[in-house]
Amino acid sequence: MRIVQLDLEHEAALRDFLAELAAHGETDIHGFFGEPEWTHAETVAAFTRWSCGDPPPGWVPSTTSFLVDGARILGVSNFRHWLTPHLLERGGHVGYTVRPSERGRGHAPRLLRDAARRARRMGLRQLLVVCDSGNLASARVIEKCGGAFESESPTDSGPIRRYWIDLRRAAAPTGRTDHL
């Protein structure tokens, strides 16, 4: 298993990943902002531009990463490089989704830890991660990765839980970050 950036070789794997989510009624995919009408090449190009600091107007630079095992995508994460007022209120720095058939196997913490490492390398001191209040599995993932509960906030789509991960405290004294 490895965490990679989307490439042209992942076209069939991405289609399969999205189909499994859709079959489970999941169309609002946290961590994935591709457009249905885009070709795979357009999706790859957009993710590359966004990670290099060239997002669409009104968006922030972000890095979308995929956890893959062989030719199969297991999960996706999106790390927003900074927060707008909207992201501070309800979106956070990181969104992630694991395909339904792979949930409960430790993939979500791996994606969140990778995003935390990226954030630390960019000089961030804290990482805001939110989840729907009813999503107890995601809340456990965030807490497992060092998230400290801040508050529960109402939104148009229901209440969310807000957590902060202190990236300064999360680093091991040896400089290792693989424990995150």
What residues fall within each predicted segment?
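GNAT-family acyltransferases
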Residues: 1-93, 100, 118, 156-180
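Conserved beta-strand-loop-alpha-helix junction that forms the acyl-donor binding cleft
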Residues: 129-139
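Conserved GNAT acetyl-CoA-binding A-motif
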Residues: 119-130
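Conserved catalytic-core motifs of GNAT/GCN5-like acyltransferases
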Residues: 130, 143-164
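Conserved acetyl-CoA-binding loop-helix of GNAT-fold acetyltransferases
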Residues: 95-98, 104-121, 139-144
